[in-house]
Amino acid sequence: MKENFNVSKLKNGLTILTYNMPYVNSVAINLIAKVGARYENAEEDGISHFLEHMAFKGTKTRTAKQIAEAFDAIGGHFNAYTGHENTVYYARVLSENCDKALNILADIIQNSIFSDEEIAKEYQVIMQEIAHHQDNPDDLVYEKFYNKVYREQPLGKSILGTAKTLATFTKEHFFNFIDKYYNAANLYLSIAGNIDHDKIVIIAEQLFSSLKQGVKSSFIPAKYIGGNGFINKELEQTSLVLGFEGTSYINLEKLYQTHLLSIIFGGGMSSRLFQSIREKLGLAYAVGSYNSAYFDSGVFTIYASTAHDKLELLYKEIKNEIIKMTEQVSTEEILRAKTQLRSNLQMAQEKNTYKSEEIGKNYSVFGQYISPEEIMEIIMSIKADDIINTANKIFSGTTTSAIIGPNDLQGF
């Protein structure tokens, strides 16, 4: 309901978004910075993620231990994550501790000191994260897949960076990055829960006053390229990832047409891929599809793992299902897909963690809050021809594939 939503701008331009949920006893806080891996140049690969780690490692007023103790003292859950388009610092606390949580978040965003000792320690932590990534076949095949989709463009690179770039970062690099991207024009503070909007604005005005106004970040537009990649690794199964140019955030009607297509094609146990590949042929335990949306680009992805000697048959059957998907969609399939999408959306509205992220992402992408009722209206207006047309547009494009398995499957 839009009447529960409020938005204000502080004197420095910081956007404050709240959604009142009076029936809960907690608040969920998201501080969204419009910066991620796609904003980095070649020398900065991995700095967004490294900076997110460093935010918890000491400020002008708190040591790393004191930050951890301050979080634990109010019994909250705090963390952060980095994507290609956003870096998000989030917390969930009891409503009575909202001001204390905001105080900690404001401190780590505005007053981090980036000591040489902590940089050296966190470098080792991230190197372990990269090593863990290299030991995970799913991570490897998806990294290869996105590298082929976007090649040397920022969206095709890992958010973790490389050992070479990470080793070059100093406190000056972090301070310069903060100065460029962590400003009022580029940050969104979104809060959902049992709160009073006006009180939040007053608190935020006090805590975030040192943020400079700044300018919104920009990035180089992404271009889907595509291609084929292979990783030679001896595993129990071969994993296959197929993809096509998908749908971006820009057009919500097209986006939700693609969501419905994905549900029908590979989004659940009644989906075509699941029924054909797993239930009928027994070729894979896990198989499915989804659309990854970015601001100006999208990737429609199909994934499955199978026995080494079944890869060719798996690929053939997926291709057969793709052809069928471009020809017809039944009324029953559309109804099931809409019900799934509607149920997921409506049940998510009950969680303040979801609402906080939803209003923040809405504003950072669209510059406005798009209500669940507006989204449902879009979903319910979609017809069979819309889904078939979307399928034809997506599946007629350049294919990208990535495979991880034994060397004799290369170029199967």
From Swiss-Prot:
GO terms for molecular function: metal ion binding; metalloendopeptidase activity. Pfam families: Peptidase_M16, Peptidase_M16_C. InterPro entries: Metalloenz_LuxS/M16, MPP/UQCRC_Complex, Pept_M16_N, Pept_M16_Zn_BS, Peptidase_M16_C. Divalent metal cations. Binds Zn(2+). Zn(2+) binds at H49, H53, E129. Its cofactor is Zn(2+). The keyword Transmembrane does not apply. Keywords: Hydrolase, Metal-binding, Metalloprotease, Protease, Zinc. GO terms for biological process: proteolysis. The active site is at E52. Coiled coil: none annotated. It comes from the Bacteria. Its EC number is 3.4.24.-. Belongs to the peptidase M16 family. This is Uncharacterized zinc protease RC0293. It comes from Rickettsia conorii (strain ATCC VR-613 / Malish 7).
